[in-house]
Amino acid sequence: MDFISMKETLKTRFFPVLVIFGDDEWLKSKAVSNVRDCLQIDFPDVNCFTYEQGVDVDELITACNTLPFFSKQKFILVENFAFPTGKKASEVKSKLENYLQTADDSCVLVFVSEESKPFEGIKGIELVNCKRLAEKQVVSWITAYCKRQGRQILPTVATKISQYCLCDMARVATETEKLCSYATSQITDQDVELLVHKDTNYEIFKLGEAIASKNNAKSLDMLQGLLNRGEQPRALFGLLYNFYRRMYYVRTTNYTHQQLADMLGVKKDWMIRQVEGIANQYKPMQLKRALDCFASCDEKLKRFFNESEEIQLLVLNLLAL
């Protein structure tokens, strides 16, 4: 199941072992809370346990088989569990499957992990996908949260919040809470512009969009705005280079988003999906020439040419592709 459906699912079904995985830390934290909130736990100090990465699976199973202390249920959380490889991986899977055959509803064991792959195929384990939400889902969350706080917000305004925060729910939640505290009834577009900080990667994405559209004036204005705000030219160079490098590989390989993310050392595959639409506006050879422009700019930066002028020249060269 995914994060969106889990709350309703947990109302009617019990799962002795769950694996919460994905790339959104806020969602994973909320998912853990959702599981714990569904349980009937008295004396949480002695019936709720958290284990770190190095815990042994035998120790976990022993803890699970120990009865709760004056409580109907207990809760065991394992953060960043290091799943072994090879023969030991098979042993761990076998032990977990054996435990699940006799597990009752007195204990819930939750693993929090970056990925689900090590746990796939273990009979009885429920996987909870907490990957970054789509923009539409984030907008729905913002709208619902504002309504609970007695605030109104238009879908277009909620969309702007999600975009400025790159659908990162930790930032979305913080910024939405801030806006609800600021506005008395209606959260407006002006409120968002005033209070919500645009993620630099979002601004690089918009800059890349403007460059791909051959909008010279907008591209140079956006770049100057970033420089005026205090962004360092070398930092902008690195972000823009990564953006074009991802586009180049999107256009020149047949890899999946996750394969590209792994190859490029990108932790989250949504960063690859993000650039796909813009990449399709270029021919592969244009993107190869773009990387050549970056190589030339990098050489000049290393020779201590004026950094601001060189990053502006780089953008002009990209516009000319």
Language-model features: where?
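Conserved beta/loop motifs at nucleotide-recognition and modification sites
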Residues: 1-321
